[in-house]
């Protein structure tokens, strides 16, 4: 599940970044996550010199990143708030910067997942909206182990939710699970 338009991809697969001083204690972990992409894809990360367009990795109040390169250009935020500085979350947010959207937002997700909407915390429903086919590019089969797939308890109000189907420590969006099983989220 990736950005629809080529203009949202970083030129030559090179993502320019800057890490704010407030994240210095996590810099090695951030760089390790970047290396994970570089080792398994054609994506390269390069520290900002004076470029106008770059990913500004900063301390924020939540975990979020823009999906792909901004049409407008300039700095774009990648926020690592409280609880967002583990390897899997950093890998996930970098995935958004690369151009990947959530696996559970794919247009064909209902063939693979059951979303229990009644278990979604109030105000978090937008995290489970399917993307319109006109706004996304579906890549490969559904990946149950994708770093871009939320765990079964994400935004859940129910502690009895189904277990997560993968380990966020080692998975990348490029590891494809060919399973035909249907998983349940929330």
Swiss-Prot record:
Pfam families: Astacin. Its main location: secreted. PROSITE patterns: ASTACIN (PS51864), ZINC_PROTEASE (PS00142). GO terms for molecular function: metalloendopeptidase activity; toxin activity; zinc ion binding. Expressed by the venom gland. GO terms for biological process: proteolysis. Monomer. Its EC number is 3.4.24.-. Residues 1-186 form the Peptidase M12A domain. Zn(2+) binds at residues 92, 96, 102. Binds 1 zinc ion per subunit. The active site is at 93. The keyword Manganese does not apply. Zinc metalloprotease. Provoques deadhesion of endothelial cells from cell cultures, and also degradation of fibronectin, fibrinogen and gelatin in vitro. Its role in the venom is not fully understood but it might act as a spreading factor that facilitates diffusion of other venom toxins. Alternatively, it might be involved in the proteolytic processing of other venom toxins or it might play a role in extra-oral digestion of prey. Inhibited by 1,10-phenanthroline. Disulfide bonds join 42-177, 63-84. This is Astacin-like metalloprotease toxin 5. It comes from Loxosceles gaucho.
């Amino acid at each position: 599940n990736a950005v629809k338009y080529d203009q949202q991809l970083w030129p030559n697969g090179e993502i320019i970044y800057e890490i704010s001083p407030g994240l210095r204690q996590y810099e090695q972990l951030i760089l390790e996550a970047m290396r994970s992409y570089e080792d398994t894809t054609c994506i390269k990360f390069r520290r900002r010199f004076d470029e106008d367009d770059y990913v500004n990795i900063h301390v924020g109040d939540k975990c979020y990143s823009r999906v792909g390169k901004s049409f407008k250009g300039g700095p774009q935020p990648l926020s690592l708030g409280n609880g967002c500085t583990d390897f899997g979350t950093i890998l996930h947010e970098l995935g958004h910067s690369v151009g990947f959207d959530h696996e559970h937002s794919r247009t064909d997700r209902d063939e693979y997942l059951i979303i229990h909407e009644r278990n979604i915390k109030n105000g978090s429903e937008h995290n489970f909206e399917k993307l319109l086919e006109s706004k996304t590019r579906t890549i490969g089969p559904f990946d149950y182990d994708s770093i871009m797939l939320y765990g079964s308890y994400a935004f859940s109000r129910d502690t009895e939710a189904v277990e997560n189907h993968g380990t966020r420590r080692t998975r990348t969006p490029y590891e494809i699970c060919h399973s035909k099983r249907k998983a349940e989220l929330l």
